[in-house]
Design a protein with these regions (language model features):
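Short hydrophobic alpha-helical segments enriched in small aliphatic residues
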Residues: 4-6, 10, 19-22
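N-terminal membrane-targeting hydrophobic helices
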Residues: 14-20, 25-215
Length: 215
């Protein structure tokens, strides 16, 4: 009798486990497939903007700690993928490329960063502008990509999703496995051509002009 009860309990536990885990596994599978279809500029490229700004402005105006804050701000908007994992619809204001990619969000992050201006060895105004441009550049670069939905760049004043008229950056999948197995080389080549080279070239030109004028 004890053995029969044990077998019944085991079957019951297995049934309950399947009932709970199957929907979760299905949701996880749908989430993973959705991430594979989403297009963004890659996490390797968003930090190029704050690095280029730092090169152009020089160490006297942009300290290494502030550069680190700018790099963090440049990739921060893509934390909205956590919402996708939790079931937030892509097209929602709180979905991917929603409010976190807006100018208002960038301004809010920049204001928060000014609280640590002394720690970054920078003025509050300098901290605000550097972090704002670093974070706002994320949505701008995403508007240059060739796939996915547009960007709610002007949220909350407009929930329209925008792309720029010219879209030249090959989109990166948010799936890490797919990025390294399928799209990575093509995406990085595109970003090198359209983001890295222009940004860094402009940065070194501005730096050279500043040094020339300082003599």
């Amino acid at each position: 009798m004890g053995c029969d009860n044990a077998r019944i309990d085991a079957r019951l536990a297995n049934t309950i486990s399947c009932a709970i885990c199957a929907p979760l596994a299905s949701a996880a599978g749908r989430s993973t497939r959705a991430l594979e279809r989403i297009g963004v500029a890659s996490a390797f490229t968003h930090p190029v903007v704050p690095v280029a700004l730092a090169i152009a402005m020089g160490r006297s105006r942009v300290s290494l700690p502030l550069v680190a804050v700018g790099i963090a701000a440049s990739v921060l908007p893509d934390l909205d993928i956590v919402g996708l994992r939790l079931g937030v619809p892509y097209g929602s204001d709180f979905g991917h490329r929603g409010f976190s990619h807006s100018l208002v969000f960038a301004a809010a992050i920049a204001v928060l960063a000014t609280l640590g201006a002394a720690r970054w060895h920078a003025s509050r105004a300098g901290t605000f502008m550097f972090v704002f441009l670093s974070c706002a550049s994320h949505g701008f670069l995403d508007m240059l990509t060739t796939a996915g939905w547009g960007v709610e760049y002007f949220w909350p004043f407009s929930t329209h999703r925008y792309f720029l008229p010219v879209r030249v950056i090959d989109s990166s999948s948010l799936s890490i496995a797919r990025f390294f197995q399928v799209t990575g080389g093509r995406v990085l080549h595109s970003e090198l051509l359209w983001v890295w080279v222009p940004c860094l070239s402009a940065a070194f030109i501005v730096r050279a002009i500043r040094k020339s004028n300082a003599r």
